[in-house]
Amino acid sequence: MGKIIGIDLGTTNSCVAVMQGTQPTVIENSEGYRTTPSMVAFTKTGERLIGQAAKRQAVTNPKNTIFSIKRFMGRKYDEVPNEKKFASYDVVNEGGDARVKIGEKSYSPQEISAMILQKMKQTAEDFLGEKVTEAVITVPAYFNDAQRQATKDAGKIAGLEVKRIINEPTAAALAYGLDKKKENEKVAVFDLGGGTFDISILELGDGVFEVKSTDGDTHLGGDDFDQVIIDYLADEFKKQEGIDLRKDAIALQRLKEAAEKAKIELSSRTDTEINLPFITATQEGPKHLVINLTRAKFEAMSATLFDKVLEPCRRALKNSKLDMKEIDEVVLVGGSSRIPKVQALVKEFFGKEPNKSVNPDEVVAIGAAIQGGVLQGDVTDVLLLDVTPLSLGIETLGGVMTKLIEANSTIPTRKQETFSTAADNQTSVEVHVLQGERPMASDNKTLGRFHLGDIPPAPRGIPQIEVTFDIDANGILNVSAKDKATGKEQSIKIEASGKLTEAEIEKMKEDAKAHADEDQKRKEEIDLKNSADSLIFSTEKQLSELGDKLPADKKAEIESALEKLKEAHKAGSADAIKPAMDELSKVWSEAASNLYQQPGAEAGAAPQPETNGQQESKGGDGAVNAEYEVIDGDDDKK
């Protein structure tokens, strides 16, 4: 049985971890980093870049570089006006859903997220040396049903069976509390990430992690703080030069990177200089942006964002039915929790110094890996009791939302309630499923609708329609309605996740697999070209050193084979490169044998093209074996 990995699919960065025995391990990606930028780019040649590679080229390719896709997951086009405004890529309306347009093709947010998940899956497979097919994926606690289902769909497209969707602050609490022995510790997890904010109040004790309440804002995170700085820089430059940099995609991407860097620097310094030479040009010549930004100025500009952080904290505390002084620890999670003003607000609100013992960038993935270990049976004596973040109900007479499951109910849960018809001789009812806290149905999020028909005609109020809401451990909802008189039943699995059907998901899975195969083929081609390049270099080098010792006919054969390899390498055809390399290696090997047979030839002088070492080492640690010469070997041994 393969390992169940834990993935923190973040707005800005993603992270993957796995249980190694009884301890969770964060896995480094192929570039050597423990977190991977949640970015996908498409180059002019059609190559797909993910993570660090996508981030590196974002300035020169802003239109085709996708970031913060998590903010579009499970959302309708008309729900994301602000997110759309700040994206450098095109967000289009297709059937009411928000999709990303790259060239002639459009992608659902689930497809883009699946590409990031594929990268995390590959990272885990490289580390474990085995196929990975199962994962626990985290989501913001305040994600609604549609956003959770969209995340599950993304995992499926990436070739992963999502064993559990787990809330980010709950995952962080798992990581924080796994080794804690204190009984009944009450913990507030304050999670301010790249795009979302969650606050969860939990009680930990004797291996039980019970979520008392959760609240948050899915429109508040590091991106919003970056935007404050971007707007400030653009406004200042416009005042000075009369040019709006927001209208230039490349300049805007440079502003975005500079804003993120400035925000990070202001967490450890009181001021920073933002210096962007050649940001634009006019007839007068190039223009440069040089602006000094102080921490005090940044905090003043971000005042409304800081205010938005506290209201969910108040609601979560109230719903937990705990007193402020009962909270034992406040654990900071998410990269944006490093902002000094945020830490000061948390300290002031909770009346205690926040706990910074966990790595805010990695702790969520670690918690997901622990949950994977629990599901696999590797981690025992841990019971996780999570809650649903928002109330669930149906629309009833007068356009009112009638709640069946209240917010902060422990999941999994099942609730039944009996309703009746609103008119005489009514033979069908529409069940309009809603999620939210507002009293009127129209002010809440529609999760789905379905009809129950063939109800026997009767006076209003007589038929009995039993409606059942069933939430699984992932927080995903199933609803059914049954006419008690006839036993006729109708049900719906809520899948308002951008309306992806099973057929669409399967097609996207095939596309994703094809891309993965293409990526692997491209990597193999690059490795082959690099090997050819190395063989050309080493052959030329040793020909110049040993060419006069070779018979003329052998030297001519080598030069001819070398020329063929150069032509194949220049053409870039893998099919031509491989046989050309084999031919050159063969004729060189024959020539080397002749050298051995020459009088006075030393074993150490026999030429060896360095490609042999390189190719042989590929199956191991990727190191390249250097060309070497043994000199007085016996004397050097100690």
Curated annotation (Swiss-Prot):
InterPro entries: ATPase_NBD (IPR043129), Chaperone_DnaK (IPR012725), Heat_shock_70_CS (IPR018181), HSP70_C_sf (IPR029048), HSP70_peptide-bd_sf (IPR029047), Hsp_70_fam (IPR013126). Residues 592-638 are annotated as: Disordered. Induction: By stress conditions e.g. heat shock. SUPFAM superfamilies: Actin-like ATPase domain (SSF53067), Heat shock protein 70kD (HSP70), C-terminal subdomain (SSF100934), Heat shock protein 70kD (HSP70), peptide-binding domain (SSF100920). Residues 597-610 have a biased composition (Low complexity). Residues 629-638 have a biased composition (Acidic residues). Keywords: ATP-binding, Chaperone, Nucleotide-binding, Phosphoprotein, Stress response. The modification Phosphothreonine is found at residue 196. Transmembrane segments: none annotated. GO terms for molecular function: ATP binding; ATP-dependent protein folding chaperone; unfolded protein binding. Belongs to the heat shock protein 70 family. Acts as a chaperone. HAMAP family: DnaK (MF_00332). This is Chaperone protein DnaK.
